[in-house]
Amino acid sequence: MKQRQFFGTDGIRGKVGAGKMTPELALKLGWAAGRVLSRSGTQKVIIGKDTRISGYLFESALEAGLSAAGLDVMLIGPMPTPAVAYLTRTFRAEAGIVISASHNPYYDNGIKFFANDGSKLDDEVELEIEAELEKPLTCVESHLLGKVNRIDDAAGRYIEYCKSHFPAEQTLSGLKIVVDCAHGATYHIAPSVFRELGAEVIAIGDKPNGLNINDKVGATSMGQICETVLAENADLGIALDGDGDRIMMVNRHGRVIDGDEILYILACDAQKRGVLRGGVVGTLMSNLGLDLALQALEIPFVRSKVGDRYVMELLKEHDWRIGGENSGHILNLDHGTTGDGIVAGILVLAAMQRQNASLEALTANITMLPQVLVNVRFEGDNDPLASEVVLAAQAEVEQKLGARGRVLLRKSGTEPLLRVMVEGDEQEAVTEYANYIADAVRNLV
């Protein structure tokens, strides 16, 4: 298959006003996508965005391009990425478009597409859109231009969808939860969801101003929520990222519960209820502790490349339901078509209620091994992964670690860096081993 030149593994992303993320390219992209999507289906597209100030700019540009190609547009304003996937399905739209750079700072933005079933757009369709980008922009006849409408009740629809994943006979009454919305797309959704299910909610990161998304808050900056959980004597914390597709949690003692531990909780709960349907998909970066804990329960575990797109590929290949990344992208195909931080949090809370157990109790039988990541710059044409010296250092460390450790060497896709990751039982030894391999890379001539 021809390689995509424009789309990455998760759409298009970059600094606003530079590279691909310009108004001109957004206009052309809307038109090109409209040309491809108008060949079949309902002739309508949903557009949602996060809270970045540049969202208005790209929303207008995409809207104009789609209209010029003859497609109707439905705007839903600031909404989580998984909400766009859900509403695309329920409105029988031909596609959904998300304007977001996820966990990146406000000065970045991105554009990604969902197919009509709420899944990521196929590579073949993205290649068709790229082919249209090479053509001069035209406009359909005036009577064929697309119309634009706003879905005023989009937030309410999605709130009810999220709540539907919590058992009707259960309530969160008596729980105090800190919810961190990262000043992002969940700011008007997540607090309402958990309050309406009965919890006492303390919301932080819920006052977006266009410039503060992911700024010292959210799933990639856990300091504030950990402090708030302790200060408020809360039962737990739920931290979402800027577009709401990833989650991290905090137990009552202020300890972070990452994506690997959330996967463990969901897999254990599904196994207890007899609905697991296979095993769990993690990634190359998933902690060995998850692998070992699932082995103890005789739950199969496989690793994909890093990225929720690749997790989804393996889930479909194995016909399994649960997978995700340690960064907090959680997929449960019985509860949606894409990563959804709010829904993942609801599923963990449902497991707590069913088992009458705290977050601490649900993670008592998984021990996360110390993990050290060292980024090493290499020079010239030297490929460290082809170096006998580096490979010998890796083999030596792997022999010392045995079955209770792991080494992963990955090259960066954007710069001459080798990422050296080592896991093992002892922090001091793991750090020593990672630096030993890193030194072998640095000494390459």
UniProtKB/Swiss-Prot annotation:
Species in which this protein is naturally found: Shewanella pealeana (strain ATCC 700345 / ANG-SQ1)
Entry superkingdom: Bacteria
Binding site for Mg(2+): 102, 241, 243, 245
Catalytic residues (positions): 102 (phosphoserine intermediate)
UniProt similarity note: Belongs to the phosphohexose mutase family.
Enzyme nomenclature, EC number: 5.4.2.10
Keywords assigned by UniProt, alphabetized: Isomerase, Magnesium, Metal-binding, Phosphoprotein
Cellular component, GO annotation: cytosol
Phosphoserine: residues bearing it: 102
Gene name in the database record: glmM
Reactions it catalyzes: alpha-D-glucosamine 1-phosphate = D-glucosamine 6-phosphate
Phosphoprotein keyword on record: yes
Cited NCBIfam families: glmM, PRK10887.1
Record's protein name: Phosphoglucosamine mutase
Coiled-coil segments: none
Cofactor(s) essential for the protein: Mg(2+)
HAMAP family for the chain: GlmM_B
GO molecular function: magnesium ion binding; phosphoglucosamine mutase activity; phosphomannomutase activity
Biological process annotations from GO: carbohydrate metabolic process; peptidoglycan biosynthetic process; UDP-N-acetylglucosamine biosynthetic process
PROSITE patterns: PGM_PMM
Function: Catalyzes the conversion of glucosamine-6-phosphate to glucosamine-1-phosphate.
